[in-house]
Every structure is written in structure tokens, then in C-alpha cells.
Amino acid sequence: MRECYSGDIFVAAFYRQNEESFLEGIVKGLEYFGGTPQKIIFDNARVAVKEGFGHHAKTTDKYLALSAHYSFRPVFCNPAQGHEKGLVEDLVGLVRRNAFVPMPNISTIEELNAKLLEYCSMYRSHKISGKNMTIGEMAENCKEHWIPLPPYRFDPSNTIQVKTDDFSLVRFDHNKYSVPYQYSSKMITVKGSGNKVEILFCGKTIAEYDRDYRYDRTHYCLEHYIGLIEKRPRSVYNAAPIKETVPTEL
């Protein structure tokens, strides 16, 4: 994301270009900027547009809810018209050249996003050619024209209600994730964000995972089954959670 007047930037990385990642990126960007502009210009992306393009674009229900929550007017570009969003097109190369040269040693997407956020903060001290103030100073000046953030954060996640199976597993987006055995065969809530899967029962988080976009994978957390294994000690030899999480050398 890039603010047109000041040139202030926000960049975040996600595993996939899906609706929840797109919406989460906007929410985090507005929080980073500290407010909402009167309008936001977008690519004619499928994750935000059901049909049409440009002035005739019809937004998805979730995106319409996002724009209503933050009170901004969405404006969509026409297909294959990169010049309509030139500031953002240039931003990709800017971040690649400055934040990733030389190539940093990063092992998780959390580390990657921390690196990107650090660069965004540093960029505020930069002064654009022909401007008298830094990007950060100009960003502060234009905030008086912005809409204050609402008191409650918009939830961009893909949320479903589902029943766990007899093995304390819940299916979400082609994969299975374990929950503590006490919640076996209970209705729970699964919230899939761009990079995380959060599982809740009665509003309380009972498990959290990195989101897996592969197919037919099962993710066990051994701690979820400890109490059950203590009651059935012989299951330690054949229990799937142990086979999948404990090294064979042990």
C-alpha cells in the first residue's frame, strides 16, 4: 500500500493471494498509517471484485463490509492499466532492491514481515526528490484529512463453525488440525487468516497453527493428547500424534 500525497508505504507478505490475505493486508496497512483515507485505489483483483471492472466493478460482500467498516470509497483500476496505479507498481521494485539486497537470512514468514515493517519505518525518514519534508513528516501533515480508525478492528478471516471428529481433529481448507482431546466431537470455531489458523471454543483460543495451503495434510500437536495417553499408556506405541510428532530415534 502507498499513500499518494506523502509516498508513505506499507508492505506485508502472505502465503497466498486470497481474499483473507488481501483484506488482512488492508487492515494492517490502515493500522500502520494510523487512519483511513477518503478513498483507496485498487487493482481490479478477483479477490475484491465479483464482476465488471473500473467504475463498473461490483465488489465482493466481504470487501464491501471492509470499506463500510473503515468508511472509505473504493476505486478500481481498469484491466491491464498499470499506469493507473503506478505508485504501487513501482513499490514492488523499491522494496525488492532496498530491503532484500543483499538477501537477508530469513526462516519464517514472521521474520520476513518484521523485516518488511522495519524497512517501511526506515523509509519514513527518506526525502523524495523535490520535496522539502521527509515522507514521515508529510504523512503526519495529511492525517488531519483522514478518517480516524474505528474502535473495533475488522475481522478479515475466513471463519467457519465445524464439529471436531472423534480423533480431536478439525478440517479446514483441505487439511486437518488437532485440538486438545477434551474438545473431541464438539462444535468449535475456526478462523483462517492469511498465514494462520486459529481454533476457538466459546470465544477462547484452544489451538493455533501456521496455515498450510497444501492438500490432505494432518497437523498434530502432541500436547493436545498427553492427558488421553496418560489414561491409555499402551497407545503410545501406535498413536498417530506420537508417530507424526516424535522422532523415530526416540
Model-derived segments and their meaning:
Residues L64, A68-K85, P104-I106:
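RNase H-like polynucleotidyl transferase catalytic core
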Residues V197-L250:
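Protein C-terminal end segments and domain termini
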Residues G35-H55:
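Acidic/histidine-rich, metal-coordinating catalytic segments
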Residues F42, G54, P74-R96, L112:
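RNase H-like two-metal-ion nuclease catalytic core shared by retroviral integrases
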Residues V11-G34, Y213-Y220:
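Active-site beta-loop-alpha junctions of metal-dependent nucleic acid enzymes
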Residues M1-G7, F14, L66:
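Short conserved beta-strand segments at catalytic cores or DNA/RNA-binding microdomains
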Residues V92-K191:
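Active-site-proximal acidic segments at structured loop/helix or strand boundaries
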